[in-house]
A protein has these predicted regions:
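Secondary-structure boundary elements
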Residues: 44-177
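Cysteine-centered nucleophilic/redox motifs
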Residues: 13, 148, 178-203, 218
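Sec-dependent N-terminal signal peptides
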Residues: 4-13
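Mature N-terminal, pre-catalytic/accessory segment of carbohydrate-active enzymes
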Residues: 20-33
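Structured interaction patches on ligand/partner-binding surfaces of diverse proteins
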Residues: 371-396
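His-Asp-centered catalytic microenvironments across diverse enzyme cores
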Residues: 161-162, 195, 206-211, 216, ...
Length: 396
């Protein structure tokens, strides 16, 4: 927060001119760097690194030093910092979409070496080598983002698996295990996109509206705005969780949606794996998701290709149709291998009109998957036609 306020003051006081930290650095960085290095135990080493950085890359290095978390400023390996700046600037110079990025977008959404609070890895050069060939023929940000998103599973060899070692894995940790949580997968995608000059950021919610769990995903910036996507690409602004995101609660941290920012915002990103931490800067984006979800629902219904489908779980077949016999259960919905939705069914104390309902494309075969009372995976498969449909499952 202090450095954020310093920036506002310094922009007014030092609108032009050079920095005493070296040529290529605007003067308004001086008070920011002064504040960042004032109590840093290796300030001299960082100043030396800044002097040794090529002039064309020096502002990028200064920007990172100005906003780095104190822990990184004190301990992050300087060769990692140097490599990160070198490859980020190389990508900006090489790719046509990166050349036209506003400085503010490049600095905060391409340059940073971390997506959230993961271990700091030397991923930038490795990912540049992996993904630069994927975008060699692309001409726009959207084309390049889609090319990376479609190829990432094959190029990093990581799959979703709850047996992963920890939630917030770094790229190297995930690739070593060949598995990651949604958090680890999102870190991989953010870094892969950034490696070739594509603005990307980590997004998530501590819990959905029904408290059935947290989720993380990725946003990509193109055409002047943010678009959501996931590690397993199904299209931009298309995801199984959109209906849930549309029910997120504005201003309620436990059920809101946040995006990570490297630069301070005056707010923080809630880390479900480290609930007491305030170390990651964030910005709430709940309202945008609510508005997008509502507009998407109206569009799907107006198009006539989708129909409402409700799913209810009862204790036994004899309980069907009773309020008291309903069971709250987490449900995932698939069309073939693709997840198209998810939610939590209504329990016995909820209003009869309150239940798990989603829009599904007509003339499709869908599977509702949940765990029964014995902890066994249970599936109910139905054919969805032209009319609204109610589907039931049983715990016993």
């Amino acid at each position: 927060m202090i450095r954020w306020l310093i920036l506002l003051l310094s922009l007014g006081l030092c609108a032009c001119g050079g920095s005493r930290y070296g040529s290529g650095i605007p003067a308004y960085y001086d008070p920011l760097l002064d504040a960042a290095l004032a109590e840093c135990p290796r300030a001299d080493s960082l100043r030396q690194l800044l002097r040794e950085t090529p002039r064309a890359e020096r502002e990028a290095m200064a920007w990172l030093m100005a906003w780095m978390p104190c822990g990184d400023l004190d301990t992050m390996r300087l060769d990692l910092l140097r490599e990160n700046v070198t490859y980020a600037c190389r990508a900006r110079a090489q790719f046509p979409w990166a050349q036209t990025l506003p400085d503010s977008i490049f600095l905060n959404e391409v340059l940073p070496y971390a997506a959230v609070d993961e271990v700091r890895d030397a991923w930038r050069g490795d990912f540049y080598a992996r993904f630069a060939p994927c975008v060699a023929s692309c001409r726009t940000l959207r084309e390049a983002a889609e090319a990376v998103n479609r190829s990432i599973v094959e190029r990093v060899g990581v799959e979703y698996n709850t047996l992963r070692e920890k939630t917030n894995q770094s790229p190297a940790e995930s690739m070593r295990q060949h598995m990651a949580s949604c958090t680890g997968l999102s870190v991989l995608l953010v870094d892969a996109l950034r490696s070739v000059g594509i603005p990307a950021r980590f997004v998530g919610t501590p819990a959905w509206h029904d408290d059935r769990g947290n989720h993380s995903w990725t946003e990509v910036w193109f055409d002047g705005e943010w678009h959501f996507t996931e590690y397993y690409f199904s299209g931009f602004d298309r995801a199984w969780f959109l209906a849930d995101a549309g029910r997120a609660t504005v201003g309620e941290r436990a059920h809101a949606i946040y995006a990570v920012s490297f630069r301070p915002t005056g707010d923080w990103f809630p880390l479900v794996w480290n609930e007491g931490s305030r170390s990651v800067n964030g910005v709430e984006v709940t309202r945008r998701y609510r508005d997008f979800s509502a507009a998407n629902t109206r569009s799907l219904l107006a198009g006539g290709e989708y129909v409402p489908v409700r799913f209810t779980v009862y204790r036994t077949a004899s309980d069907e149709g009773t309020s008291a016999g309903r069971v709250a259960a987490n449900v995932d919905v698939f069309r073939g291998a693709e997840q198209v939705g998810g939610g939590r069914t209504a329990g016995p104390r909820q209003d009869l009109n309150d239940g798990f309902e989603l829009l599904l494309e007509k003339q499709g075969r869908y599977t509702f998957r949940y765990e029964n009372a014995r902890g066994e995976r249970t599936e109910v498969t139905v054919e969805v036609g032209d009319e609204p449909l109610s589907v039931v499952g049983y715990m016993e």
